[in-house]
């Protein structure tokens, strides 16, 4: 279980699915343990679709300095997780093996992403916080608030 604590005290608890996406989960847990995500923002918010975070630059262009294999069907990995409301998945470029630290949480269902991105867990508490973030008025430069991400005991 991983907990994201927002600057305003809002909490999002995420259960990771290590059986389906072991590489992705291991990478995510490593970044959490190192404190990589602490103080970062949800830099991309698209209401009715998803909220995205995990970029150290806050622009959508940064990462941890390495990439991992994309664990999804179009990349030869059996990953039956669907991109439904509350699912967490890895963001990437057009390169299927370009995921590093950026992730997104589904605000609404997006079946067109199934098999194309590495879903690796689901929000088990705190969808009200995701809804609140998704409701914030945004433009290309808005930052949503700092978050601290840590493993929950």
Regions found by a protein language model. Give the residues of each.
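Cyclophilin-like peptidyl-prolyl cis-trans isomerases
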Residues: 1-150
């Amino acid at each position: 279980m991983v907990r994201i604590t927002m600057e305003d005290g809002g909490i999002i608890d995420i259960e990771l699915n290590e059986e389906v996406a072991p590489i992705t989960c291991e990478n995510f847990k490593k970044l959490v343990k190192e404190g990589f995500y602490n103080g970062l923002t949800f830099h991309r918010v698209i209401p009715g679709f998803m909220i995205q975070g995990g970029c150290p630059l806050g622009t959508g262009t940064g990462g941890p300095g390495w990439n991992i294999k994309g664990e999804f069907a179009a990349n030869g990995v059996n990953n039956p997780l669907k991109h439904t409301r509350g699912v967490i998945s890895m963001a990437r470029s057009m390169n299927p093996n370009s995921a590093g630290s950026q992730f997104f949480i589904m605000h609404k269902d997006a079946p067109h992403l199934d098999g194309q991105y590495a879903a690796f867990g689901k929000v088990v508490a705190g969808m009200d916080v995701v809804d609140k973030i998704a409701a914030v008025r945004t433009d290309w430069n808005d930052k949503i608030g700092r978050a601290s991400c840590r493993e929950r005991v």
